[in-house]
């Protein structure tokens, strides 16, 4: 049975709950209205860019070169429609400036007869919901002016009272200057949170669907309006349920995002053990757990799903094709997944365009990329390059981590094999070391004939361009004949799924 929290911990929980509940962080949510329209036909010229991640200067440079910004960085796009694919936030210090500019440009574009559409990315949703794993310290610092007067001091005093004299430095490290201003501004009823919650998760312009990550089977049967309404409802419901638990002290500022359901459950159990539980608390924890598990907010959701960006085209085509037909479009343009060559590429015979070329140079070493669509013609303009180019096909198979198969098979053949443990009947987990590279893999005991079949399956897979079978060579390990396959640490086969009754992930 869980034990009640120590008195000092309970004191800080109560103090935080009272202070935060009295602040704008946990007021009753009043998000902005949803986008009135999410589909436009007959536009003619569309420009799109992806994943700014706080790189304000790079974004401005790109939009100037693409003709979207003119004198004094005002709207110069005329009647064109411009689409941001989201992920404005995190990893870069200037995300507040990015939002300020795009909010202004939306109004200016409308006045000029054009439009600026901002599609919600997973990092916007994460910030609104308090998942702050990727917030750059400079992003917090940009919100110092929005911290409620006295809130930091009161919370710091409560922390020190709960944790003892001298513990304030730990508070300062956990909640850096601007943290509470950031939470106020990006809360569902905050200046930026209201704007973000009013953004669509997907838009259609002419014959193109624009979405941050990609469409999955979860979207089957939904209209574009349904998708946007359901996604926004899921975000608002999560925020509402979280607010209730925070005010009740069952969740606290700074709790790890992924641990929230477990923490709320454990704290509820501790209260029950102390005779302080109530049906209202139990219902609140249940409601929050359900909101956290909503399929649109999880790996199959439109802000996370990478199937169209990464999965085998033969298998994923059965997912993609009916969804494009469902939304009555010829293609989908996505960000979220940086391309390996940091250039815009196409997949599925042009039905998917991957546009995340790593605009934030400090993090991704890439460049801004602006895709222009005019009828059937697609071209990409990169920052600092004078000429636009046509996005090239990525190809059916791309070697993992950009390591060529020849290099992998050479390492598997000549490298030193170390056994790390048993994997299953006649199988061992191994590590292959070769020329400074460590490759995780699996050794499978096989007869000479079966080993040749395994290698033949690998070669046929590559000949067909599928990329399903891992690199495979014939080897002896611990005196046993068989094959060694290179496999990522968390790789599982369909046989593993069946044997262990595993729950499959959201994409390949």
Predicted regions and their residues:
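FAD-dinucleotide binding site
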Residues: 212, 402, 413-415
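Juxta-kinase regulatory segment immediately upstream of eukaryotic protein kinase catalytic domains
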Residues: 395-407
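Bacterial N-terminal signal peptides that target proteins for export
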Residues: 1-13
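Intrinsically disordered, low-complexity regions enriched in serine, threonine, proline
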Residues: 5-7, 24, 472
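Short linear motifs in intrinsically disordered
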Residues: 2, 190-194, 360-363, 413-423
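Feature recognizes metal-dependent phosphohydrolase scaffolds
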Residues: 27-396
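Bacterial N-terminal signal peptides
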Residues: 13-23
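Conserved ATP-binding subdomain of kinase catalytic cores across diverse folds
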Residues: 406-507
